[in-house]
Amino acid sequence: MSAQAAVASAPGGATQVEPEYKLQVCRGLALVVDDNPDITEMLAAVLRHAGYTVSTAHSAPDALDAALARHFDVVVSDIGMPGMNGHELAQVLRAMPEYRSIPMVAVTGFDMYDDYDRSREAGFDFHLSKPIDPVALTQAIRRIRH
C-alpha cells in the first residue's frame, strides 16, 4: 500500500489534510522455476509488477517442495532444467488435485512446433519462447485465469 496526502490551508484558517491511499491488488501467489537465476529474477519481477506475490525455485525438485508447502495460483516454469525437467514437473503438479486447474506457463528456449505440443501434453496451458516478452507472459496468465 502507498499513501499520499494533499494539504491545504488558508491564512488564519484550519489546515485540511486529504489522504489518498493506493492499494496494490494482489492477484495471488506465483511460483517461478528456472535454473538460471537471472531469468528467475526477471520473471519474478514481471509477476510482482503485475501484482503477484512470488516465490522462486531453481530446480523442479525445489519447486515441488515449494508446491507442497503452500498453494500457488500460477506456475511459470522453464522446460530445459537438469535432472527433472519442466515437463516432468508439470505432470507431477497436474496429478495433485490442488494444481489440476491453475494456470501453468512454460517459458523455454525450445521453439519448434512439436515443443508446443509436448508442453500442452505435459499440462502447461501456454508455451512461451525465450527471450520472454513481459506483456505476453502477463497476457497469457490473464487469458488462462478468465
State the predicted function of each range.
Residues M1-L31, A44, V135-H146:
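Non-catalytic signal-transmission and effector/linker regions of two-component phosphorelay proteins
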Residues N36-T40:
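Short acidic/polar segment at the start of the alpha1 helix of CheY-like receiver
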Residues E41-H49:
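Charged docking surfaces used in two-component/phosphorelay signaling
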Residues G51-H58, A66, L128:
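Short hydrophobic/Thr-rich beta-strand motif most characteristic of the beta2 strand and flanking loop
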Residues R70-V76:
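Active-site beta3 strand of CheY-like receiver
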Residues M81:
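Receiver (REC) domain active-site loop signature in two-component systems and cognate sites
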